[in-house]
Every structure is written in structure tokens, then in C-alpha cells.
A protein has these predicted regions:
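Conserved H-loop
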Residues: 34, 123-128
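Short acidic-hydrophobic, aromatic-tinged amphipathic segments that line or gate anion-handling sites
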Residues: 131-132, 192-199
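Helix-loop "lid/cap" segments that line or gate small-molecule binding pockets
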Residues: 27-28, 47-61, 117, 146
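Conserved Lys-Pro-Asp/Glu-containing loop-to-beta segment of HAD-superfamily phosphomonoesterases
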Residues: 2-4, 139-165
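Substrate-recognition element of Asp-dependent hydrolases with the DxDx(T/V) motif
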Residues: 24, 92-119, 133
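Acidic, Mg2+-coordinating phosphoryl-transfer loop and its flanking beta/alpha structural elements
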Residues: 157-195
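Metal-dependent phosphoesterase signature
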Residues: 54-90, 94
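Active-site neighborhood of HAD-like aspartate-dependent phosphohydrolases
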Residues: 1-41
Length: 208
């Protein structure tokens, strides 16, 4: 029986705040825009379009492309020294693979960014499939297409935001909500809520 554990990235696998807040502040300062770190923190895990709406309201295509270029450059520069997984994630991924689970990603980002981040934090090779914004306009849509591609008998999503919960519900699979992530108040209705990565293993055993 083919079983998949499907992971969100930001706030689930990756300690994104370690580099993203500074990168965004640099890009905003370049545009003479001042926002609090809390505003940027709330953007972590959102789709690129949702981040633009939250920070700017709207941008024309040229301004958007320049913005994305700046963010990518600032993030990559800072990531080289700071990027890392949450403690225990590598051990969890290794153990899930040992137990015979297949691993996949479901993300609000685009493939190039996903590969860059997962490679930088040293876990890219654990995942056999990547679900990205190329597959849909929302996390629920991405997960639908990903599940169709995986054609698995059982699956569980692991994430830390309300759109992870929504995606799991729309697609009728259980969610492990990461209380250690960036929006613990958003995932209290998950099937299992955990407080540290190592608890993912017990949650998976219980749910699938």
C-alpha cells in the first residue's frame, strides 16, 4: 500500500523567519517603505500574490518582477549563513523513509524557489514529488493535483497555516498541525496538533 506524507515548507520544515524578515525589510527599505517585523512574519507561507496584496495592495507587472528579483537575491544571500530546518526534522524524514512512507511537498511557492530552499536546508533529496503553484492557484488546488499524480492509497498533510487546514479538508485527508510553526492559532482544528517535529511520527502512526 502506497502511503504519502505531504509536507508544507515554511513553518513546518524550514525556519523561514531566520532569513525572510531581514530580506523583506531590505527590499522594502529600498522602496522607502516601513513595516513592522510582525507584518512580514504574518506573510511567511503566503503565496507571492497574497504577499504583494498584504504589503502593497497591488503592483504592476514590471514592479512585481523587480520586487521578486530583489527578494530572491536578499534571501539567497542571507540563507547561506542562516537557513536551517526546525530541530528534529531530518530525523523525522529519515525515520518516515525507513518505515516505508513516501514523502512529498505541497507549497504555495514556485518550483525554482522550492528546490533552492530545500537544497539550502539539506533535505531536497528526501522528497519524490513536489506540488507547487504551477499546479494551481491555491494550496487546495495544488494538493488536489498532487494527490491525483501520486495515486496513493493513503496520505496525510503536515502544515502550520489555515490554508493547510483548508487544503486537507477540501481533499479529505487528515492534517497534522504544527503548533511549533508560525501560526499555531490557525491549526487548532487539525486532526492532530503537535508541539515539536519529533511528534510527527506519532501523529502519522495514529492517522494513516
Amino acid at each position: 500500500m502506497k502511503k504519502y506524507v505531504i509536507f508544507d515548507i515554511d513553518g513546518t520544515l524550514n525556519q523561514t523567519a531566520l532569513y525572510a524578515i531581514e530580506a523583506y525589510q531590505k527590499a522594502l527599505k529600498k522602496r522607502n517603505i516601513t513595516v513592522s517585523d510582525d507584518v512580514i512574519f504574518a506573510c511567511i507561507g503566503l503565496s507571492p500574490a497574497a504577499i504583494i496584496t498584504k504589503l502593497f495592495g497591488s503592483l504592476d507587472d514590471n514592479a512585481y518582477q523587480v520586487w521578486r528579483k530583489d527578494i530572491q537575491e536578499y534571501e539567497f544571500s542571507i540563507m547561506k549563513d542562516r537557513a536551517k530546518t526546525f530541530d528534529g526534522i531530518v530525523e523525522v524524514l529519515c525515520e518516515l523513509k525507513r518505515r516505508g512512507y513516501q514523502l512529498a511537498i505541497c507549497s504555495n511557492a514556485y518550483p525554482k524557489h522550492i528546490k533552492q530552499v530545500l537544497t539550502m536546508i539539506g533535505i531536497y533529496n528526501y522528497f519524490s514529488e513536489i506540488g507547487s503553484l504551477k499546479m494551481g492557484n491555491s494550496k487546495a488546488e495544488v494538493l488536489t493535483k498532487l494527490l491525483e499524480k501520486l495515486n496513493c492509497q493513503k496520505a496525510c498533510l503536515v502544515g502550520d497555516r489555515k490554508f493547510d487546514l483548508e487544503a486537507a479538508r477540501v481533499n479529505h485527508i487528515p492534517l497534522i498541525g504544527c503548533g511549533y510553526g508560525y501560526a499555531p492559532n490557525e491549526i487548532q482544528e487539525a486532526d492532530v496538533v503537535i508541539n515539536k517535529p519529533l511528534e510527527i511520527l506519532e501523529g502519522i502512526d495514529y492517522l494513516i
